[in-house]
Each structure stands twice: as C-alpha cells, then as structure tokens.
Regions:
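A short, N-terminal "cap"/entry segment at the start of jelly-roll beta-barrel domains
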Residues: 1-75, 175-180
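Double-stranded beta-helix
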Residues: 64, 70, 89-91, 99, 123-180, ...
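A short beta-loop-beta micro-motif enriched in histidine and acidic residues
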Residues: 70-84, 99-100, 107
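Short, conserved beta-strand element in jelly-roll/cupin
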Residues: 78-95, 113
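A generic structural motif
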Residues: 95-97, 123
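Short, surface-exposed beta-strand-loop junctions and turns on beta-sheet-rich folds
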Residues: 100-102, 128
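Conserved metal-binding segment of the jelly-roll/cupin
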Residues: 106-126, 135
Length: 180
C-alpha cells in the first residue's frame, strides 16, 4: 500500500507525496526497483494557466513536456522511458499496474511519475480532464500493450534513472526514492 510523506517539495509545503512499488501483475511488468510517485497538489489548482506552469516546471527540471491530452483508456506501459503526468484540469480514476490493478484518483494540481514498465489506464474522468505528458531528457517513449518480450524487459531495466526530480530538480524526492 502507498507510503505517504508530507512536504517533499522545497518550494511548496502543501505537497503530499505518495509512493509505492507495483509488483509484476498479469502481463504488465511494472518496474522492479523504482516506485510510482504521486505528488498531491504539486502545484496549486488555482495557479493561473496551470498547464503552462507545469510545462515550465517540468522543462526546467529536465523532463521536457511532450504533449497535452487525456490518458489512454486501455492498459499500456512504456518500455523505453519514465513518464510524468501533470493534471492541469479535471479529475480521473486511473488503474495502475495492469488489469485488475490499483485504482488511483488524481485531480487538478497532481503530478504522477511512472517508472518505465508501469502499467496505466484511464478508468473514468471528468469531461474536462487533461494532463501534460513529459519524459526525462533523451528518453523516447513507446507504447506496449502486451507482455514484454525479452528485449522489452531488458529495455525497462536499462532505462536510466533521471538525474532530477520533475517537480524539484536535484532536491526532489525522486532522487532519494529511485536508488540506482
């Protein structure tokens, strides 16, 4: 079950961090070492132009923003990149870890960080739900919808640990929780 830490952010003491490891489940590999991170209220929902604010923060910390959209409503994972999903509008329930996995609610202002191999899927969402998707500098993402091949499993293990936390750079909790 998730572990909760308060105030992981050097910049905003209201942030609450949840972190948890997901074991391999069904056909989804998940990540063997790095936990999923959920920053509750990473940025205040009242922040003007929250999508742009998230993009600026992610870009500044070496996680270039790649797109704005919803989340796919089918189970998938990425074998070649870690992923940050910054909720700038609406709310949703996600399924993490694969079919029958953990249901996690996210809302405006939250930041979810998924290590390579972590299954995720949209279960339900408000009509206005939108996220910014970002990946560590130099990591190109793929979309995997079936059990990993030996090459994909090796790729997941080979994706390098980011040098910075997407929210707080070198001072952020990812740097401590994602140990090499």
């Amino acid at each position: 079950m998730p572990t909760t830490d308060h105030a992981p952010s050097a910049r905003d003491k209201r942030v609450q961090l949840l972190h948890f490891l997901l074991p391999a489940h069904d056909w989804v590999p998940n990540h063997p070492r790095f936990p999923v991170l959920l920053y509750r209220q990473a940025l205040a929902p009242s922040t003007p132009d929250l999508g742009t604010a998230f993009e600026s923060r992610l870009n500044a910390n070496g996680w270039p923003a790649q797109w704005r959209d919803g989340i796919f409503d089918y189970h998938h994972y990425h074998s070649t990149a870690h992923e940050a999903l910054a909720v700038f509008q609406g709310r949703a329930e996600l399924i993490l870890g694969g079919p029958g996995g953990e249901v996690l609610a996210v809302e405006t202002g939250d930041l979810l960080v998924l290590p390579a191999g972590t299954g995720h899927c949209l279960k339900s969402a408000s009509e206005d739900f939108q996220v910014v998707g970002a990946y560590p500098q130099g990591q190109d993402w793929d979309i995997c919808r079936s059990a990993p091949t030996a090459a994909q499993r090796a790729a997941i293990h080979a994706v390098p640990r980011p040098t910075q936390d997407p929210l707080d750079g070198s001072e952020g909790p990812l740097c401590a929780l994602w140990r090499p």
